């Protein structure tokens, strides 16, 4: 399946640069690709919860949203959580922050934007790189053209700056 192919290529790029990452994964993808999930963890990367089904939380009841996150975490087993679309209601944030560390980002590649060229995607990232920055890339079909171009060049720039890619730690 597509997600499997993209993650495998991302893992190969990260390995080439001896880089570690935190993958915020969907529970439904962990169910669909358990071997790939295990490969991510076995390679020394960290995983975080990105809900089970990538629902838009602001359109769901608090109870249903929490159920979706907790159902995903039965598969993912992580204390890290990132809401889809970076949108979460105050009530959802309060409830989830009691059990999870909510993690956003410093640099969004916007690799998912079909109107964005691969070069512009790279520029979005490299102009904001700094030590400790959390940079977001995606592993979807929609983002693959830009990610495939920008991620290895970003990893190369990080290396040239004397920085290192690490997982998010609590």
Where on the chain are the PLM-derived regions?
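Distinct, well-ordered alpha-helical segments
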Residues: 10-11, 33-38, 91-96
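C-terminal domain-boundary segment and adjacent tail
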Residues: 16-18, 29-32, 145-170
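Short, small-residue-biased leader/transition segments that mark boundaries at the very start
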Residues: 1-6
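CE4/NodB-like, metal-dependent polysaccharide N-deacetylase domain
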Residues: 12-22, 45-46, 52, 62-90, ...
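His/Asp/Glu-enriched short active-site or ligand-binding loop at hydrolase and phosphoryl-transfer sites
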Residues: 87-128, 162-170
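A short acidic, helix-capping loop that chelates divalent metal ions and anchors anionic groups
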Residues: 51-60, 111-113
């Amino acid at each position: 399946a597509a997600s499997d192919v993209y993650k495998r290529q991302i893992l190969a790029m990260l390995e080439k640069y001896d880089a570690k990452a935190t993958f915020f994964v969907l529970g439904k993808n962990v169910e669909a690709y358990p071997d790939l999930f295990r490969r991510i963890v076995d390679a020394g990367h960290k995983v975080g919860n990105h809900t089970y089904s990538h629902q838009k939380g602001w359109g769901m009841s608090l109870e249903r949203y929490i159920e979706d996150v907790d159902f995903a975490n039965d598969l993912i087993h992580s204390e890290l959580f990132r809401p889809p679309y970076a949108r979460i209601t105050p009530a959802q944030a309060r409830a989830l922050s009691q059990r999870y560390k909510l993690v956003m980002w410093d640099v969004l590649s916007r690799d998912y934007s079909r109107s964005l060229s691969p070069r512009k995607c790279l520029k979005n990232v490299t102009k904001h790189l700094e030590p400790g920055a959390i940079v977001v890339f995606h592993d979807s079909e929609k983002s693959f053209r830009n990610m495939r171009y920008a991620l290895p060049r970003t990893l190369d720039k990080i290396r040239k700056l004397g920085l290192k890619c690490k997982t998010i730690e609590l």
